């Protein structure tokens, strides 16, 4: 499996295709990332490539982590991510990972932290139907029954109820790469991706067999 790249979500915009149709797109500042470590079966029990992204101040980095990062370059990096690979001979510590690793027409999987919406009710969080809104109704946005009575005498774990909505790590798969600007480290993908503008996201090649740009992991 090929390694991915870390980036920052800039926001959404639109492009127009050859027929004049508006296509919603997300702009991503992808990389550049630096290879900070190569893990091997002999030393670590598995093979992987670790990359770093985003500059960090010296006061925010612990001494052990600082020593680890300085082995691959002079700049201290804020975010680290590793990718499992079959072998590490084609990678070298200190090398840069950029948007040139991707190509237009390729499909990618993008992971990020979804936007937190705080405490939300049944309708907003789970899409429940509401009750009658007419005068006299006492069940406008109530959930209805949450279970039986004496047996089981409790609410089963996992019951869909009101609670904290969003703020979870999710992945959107099979997004099409429409445009690449390697001068600005810009990656343009079709559709939306998790997170708010400015959030850190992980972009990796789609591994669904049979899809364009995908490969067998």
Curated annotation (Swiss-Prot):
A Pfam family this chain is assigned to: Ribosomal_L3
Compositional bias segments (type: Low complexity): 142-153
InterPro entries in the cross-refs: Ribosomal_uL3, Ribosomal_uL3_bac/org-type, Ribosomal_uL3_CS, Transl_B-barrel_sf
Keywords: Ribonucleoprotein, Ribosomal protein, RNA-binding, rRNA-binding
Molecular function, one GO term: rRNA binding
UniProt keyword annotation of DNA-binding present: no
Disordered: annotated span: 127-162
Superkingdom of origin organism: Bacteria
GO cellular component: cytosolic large ribosomal subunit
Keyword Signal: no
GO biological process: translation
Family designation: Belongs to the universal ribosomal protein uL3 family.
Summary of subunit composition and partner proteins: Part of the 50S ribosomal subunit. Forms a cluster with proteins L14 and L19.
Function: One of the primary rRNA binding proteins, it binds directly near the 3'-end of the 23S rRNA, where it nucleates assembly of the 50S subunit.
Protein name: Large ribosomal subunit protein uL3
Organism whose genome encodes this protein: Prochlorococcus marinus (strain MIT 9301)
Gene: rplC
């Amino acid at each position: 499996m090929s390694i991915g790249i870390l980036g920052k979500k800039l926001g959404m915009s639109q492009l127009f295709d050859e027929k004049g149709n508006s296509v919603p797109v997300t702009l991503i500042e992808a990389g550049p990332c630096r290879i900070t470590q190569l893990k091997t079966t002999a030393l670590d029990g598995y093979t992987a490539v670790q990359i770093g992204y985003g500059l960090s101040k010296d006061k925010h980095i612990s001494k052990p982590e600082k020593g680890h990062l300085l082995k691959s370059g002079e700049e201290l990096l804020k975010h680290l991510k590793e990718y499992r690979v079959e072998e590490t001979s084609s990678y070298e510590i200190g090398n840069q990972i950029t948007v040139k690793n991707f190509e237009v027409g390729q499909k990618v999987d993008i992971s990020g932290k979804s936007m937190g919406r705080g405490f939300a009710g049944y309708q907003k969080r789970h899409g429940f139907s509401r009750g009658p809104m007419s005068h006299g109704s006492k069940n406008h946005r109530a959930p209805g029954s949450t279970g039986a009575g004496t047996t089981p005498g409790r609410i089963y774990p996992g019951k869909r109820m009101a609670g904290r909505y969003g703020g979870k790590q999710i992945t959107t798969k099979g997004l099409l790469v429409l445009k690449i600007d390697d001068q600005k480290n810009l990656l343009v993908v079709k559709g939306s991706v998790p997170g708010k503008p400015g959030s850190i996201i992980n972009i990796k090649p789609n591994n669904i067999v049979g899809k364009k740009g995908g490969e067998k992991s």
